[in-house]
Amino acid sequence: IGIGRIELPTALSFADSGFVTIGIDINTKLVEMINSNEYPLKDEPGFDKIFDNVVKNGKLSATSNISNALPKCDVILLSLPTPMNKENIPDYTALLTVGKSLNSLLSNGQIVIVESTVEPGFIETELLDCIEGQDKSLKSGIDFHLAVCPETANPGEIMKDFQKLPRLVGAIEEKISPIVSALYTHVFNVELIPMPNCKTANAVKLTTNVFRDINIAFINELALLFEKLGIDTHTVIEAAKRKYNFQAHFPGPGVGGPCLPVNSYQYLNSSKKINESFLKIVQEAR
């Protein structure tokens, strides 16, 4: 569910590995392009030939009708946007809206895998409650199984990242993790790293991105200082790289894109729910 910049290559990878795959998206124009065998990601190399093959062979189709598509599925991937609102609070509306739809559509023990980046604990609380429903009409572990496998790929290098980067897997029920691992190993042929639960897997994904955000902010501050001191920033960084445990970051306009700026606020949102004194350095880096 969700066939955007990262999600469509994911769907193509599943279809190319032999699975009959249905891409579900509210963007009807995108759905029409896919079903018309018109590849929508012109600037993403490596997937165009796969796209042509799997669409022609009937392995990949697209629809905006979630009610018709889901009963046909054994495994459901959620790869939906998790942006910020105007108050810099993570907006999980897309995931929660789909979660409510799943409540009326699941019943056969399907596995639901969340690839979207979310704050630790969101899966086990808000999303799980949403899928089970207020009246607990569905039961996790009986009517469906919930797991996570956070996506890890950079636009423009998605195929290369899919083929080399290990993936994390966590689940509400421990017994589901090996099943998800086997599925992703079959599709991507990469290492799957089991996590003890969903929130740990989500924390790892956030930590890798927020680490970059903080260090980029730090080096930008240093660059401003060095300019006043008459020191060349790049000379300092290149010389500092001689030490094996120094991880080089370079000054620039700051982080951008749909992920890194949001990820820091996801951690900050988590922190505020517990104790606002946590993660001051993350707030300063923003």
Where are these regions (language model features)?
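Structural/interface elements that position substrates and couple domains in central-metabolism enzymes
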Residues: 1-286
